[in-house]
Amino acid sequence: MATSKSGGSSKNGRDSISKRLGVKRSGGQFVKAGEIIVRQRGTKFHKGKNVGLGRDYTIFALSSGKVEFKTLKGRKYVSIV
């Protein structure tokens, strides 16, 4: 027979690792082709000129130039100029 009472198990103690989403290059910053500009879930930012959209909605530079963020009709666009 146990000399001490058994303790209850905790239902806490879990946490998921962060996904490191967000803007990686700010407006006006120079980027080279292939650099990631935004990591996102869904199209929070839409693709503009000279940028590509990955299958996980990552926006990346297709050519070298300066990053430009602009809003048109309530949508945020990312372009390279």
Curated annotation (Swiss-Prot):
GO terms for molecular function: structural constituent of ribosome. Transmembrane segments: none annotated. One of its GO terms (biological process) is translation. Residues 1-20 are annotated as: Disordered. Signal peptide: none annotated. GO terms for cellular component: cytosolic large ribosomal subunit. Belongs to the bacterial ribosomal protein bL27 family. This is Large ribosomal subunit protein bL27. It comes from Borreliella burgdorferi (strain ATCC 35210 / DSM 4680 / CIP 102532 / B31). The lineage of its organism: Bacteria, Pseudomonadati, Spirochaetota, Spirochaetia, Spirochaetales. The gene is rpmA.
